[in-house]
Curated annotation (Swiss-Prot):
Inhibited by GPC3 and diprotin A. It comes from Mus musculus. The lineage of its organism: Eukaryota, Metazoa, Chordata, Craniata, Vertebrata. It is found in: Cell membrane; Apical cell membrane; Cell projection, Invadopodium membrane; Cell projection, Lamellipodium membrane. It is an enzyme of class 3 (hydrolase). This is Dipeptidyl peptidase 4.
Amino acid sequence: MKTPWKVLLGLLGVAALVTIITVPIVLLSKDEAAADSRRTYSLADYLKSTFRVKSYSLWWVSDFEYLYKQENNILLLNAEHGNSSIFLENSTFESFGYHSVSPDRLFVLLEYNYVKQWRHSYTASYNIYDVNKRQLITEEKIPNNTQWITWSPEGHKLAYVWKNDIYVKVEPHLPSHRITSTGEENVIYNGITDWVYEEEVFGAYSALWWSPNNTFLAYAQFNDTGVPLIEYSFYSDESLQYPKTVWIPYPKAGAVNPTVKFFIVNIDSLSSSSSAAPIQIPAPASVARGDHYLCDVVWATEERISLQWLRRIQNYSVMAICDYDKINLTWNCPSEQQHVEMSTTGWVGRFRPAEPHFTSDGSSFYKIISDKDGYKHICHFPKDKKDCTFITKGAWEVISIEALTSDYLYYISNQYKEMPGGRNLYKIQLTDHTNVKCLSCDLNPERCQYYAVSFSKEAKYYQLGCWGPGLPLYTLHRSTDHKELRVLEDNSALDRMLQDVQMPSKKLDFIVLNETRFWYQMILPPHFDKSKKYPLLLDVYAGPCSQKADASFRLNWATYLASTENIIVASFDGRGSGYQGDKIMHAINRRLGTLEVEDQIEAARQFVKMGFVDSKRVAIWGWSYGGYVTSMVLGSGSGVFKCGIAVAPVSRWEYYDSVYTERYMGLPIPEDNLDHYRNSTVMSRAEHFKQVEYLLIHGTADDNVHFQQSAQISKALVDAGVDFQAMWYTDEDHGIASSTAHQHIYSHMSHFLQQCFSLH
């Protein structure tokens, strides 16, 4: 299931911050507001992306150089001085798309025939371009419909997956070496993930890991034998007389899971023989005795690797550190190098155990884990010791470790001003943990409170990406003194364009319930007047570890609703939400569909009490988990909401995948948590939908939250005699993102809200 923390888009113009309220670009008096002749941000503006936010995507290729695509040329830039040269001219890409350059910059992968599969996976064809010869390599080409391909960390070796088997090219012009031969569609996956590992565990299609100096290639093998298949029709072109049927091995809650094996192959041995024997590293006994997952792989050094394994009930994980035995040509994972991580209140990590960050010699590492108070902080694991020492602490959370040098560790946290929805870059001295400095907090505090960072290879330079609350800003910095070297992109052109638009403002604040702060955001109409009454739309996700109230910038559907329709669009992070400690996040452990649903209802009540919300025009909408919560809220009989929209909702947790669902709910068996599985369905609340207006939307080719989920809601509502609206999107997946479907769904939802709120 898509988690909102992974996705950052954008919301208003360059903003000034008044305490915790962002305000529009241009401040007008009431008289001036009444005479404001500027146009509003329209639905067409959103659907056609009239106003585009610019980013600056760079690829570090050394500790002081990076590549950047400009006007279809690939430029090589010097970080210190800013001078650039053309690395690849745009004529190289006339028939192909740029994919990646080898670490030694001698070869470039060019991609074509791209075909999307699931969220991350796709197939494509590739050509290899010789930079020095300025021509394509025509001998020993990579096969069409390759599933994954990646350069080695040094030089120009290639590993790729074709027809579920792994191949390696030692030189681009030489024949490929076949590493595996067991691959079988929908059964055995070598070096790539099956559906559930792609979506819920690795968040990627790749299951290949090169060692730092290319000597070894590690890979996972997934076996889906016995995993039940989900099947659905794909209607395709209208000339197709019989629809196609799509089959996917998809383990639902309580069903047979894929099994996993882990191997390492010595690539250097390929030079002396046509094949190399992979060596299997088994899971530790404490997890291997039952169903389990491989959830993280990190090379510490050329001959040391870290593997994290997780029990199917995801409150127990083991990190095994394995070393290469040069004499016996084997890998050893001694028990004294195993580190157990457990949770007694919920699950391990936010979505899985955090990855370790090793020192350069691989002897010790740093990792984000929960401290004794339940906040995610950085702990240092010294050499040959199982216990760790926390180097950060407080009632806030470290989001990610971004870089580790011999002297400092760099991390992103939400410590600044005790605002969970903020993100800033910090550095901490490894020899003195009291020496902590925020590198971004004071750079541009009105415009920038939500940062991301990208470090060069050895962290000598870094790019800061400010993602809000004002317009995104990208700058380049030097680590030695943190001087800003140059502005890479400031979105000044967009700023000028938005001066002529009546933009909404954004309020980020909290309410206190049961002595606990819960944060919310509101997108307020232009010239907001708290003495007036506005319709309210609650935009909800509310899944475990989600966050909707943050300081990032967005131009989206809510921008249109607030600017043109004068609707307040609010989001609330209640119990179950993330980045505020395990007490809040684990509150919904083993009881999805309860507290997070109640909290959205209570939030709406609190918003009405603020005085500027029309209590008779309150709506709710959400997508995916948000569609589930929307439906559960509307089916609660609370009397708070007039209408709502659920897009691609879960309706019964036994219908959803095992990895995600069981993380929070356990198993749907009588000995575990079957009762709550059965008591948390949307269908059981069908009778209460007579009190509300309901729009149900789903794509027929949703591989993630299957159409079955909405079909069962529809059936229950019909059986209960409920009048409701429904819309399906033929052959659309979970994102309903094709150009025509995207425009249609947002137009349709807009019309539904206009009718519900009596706007036109």
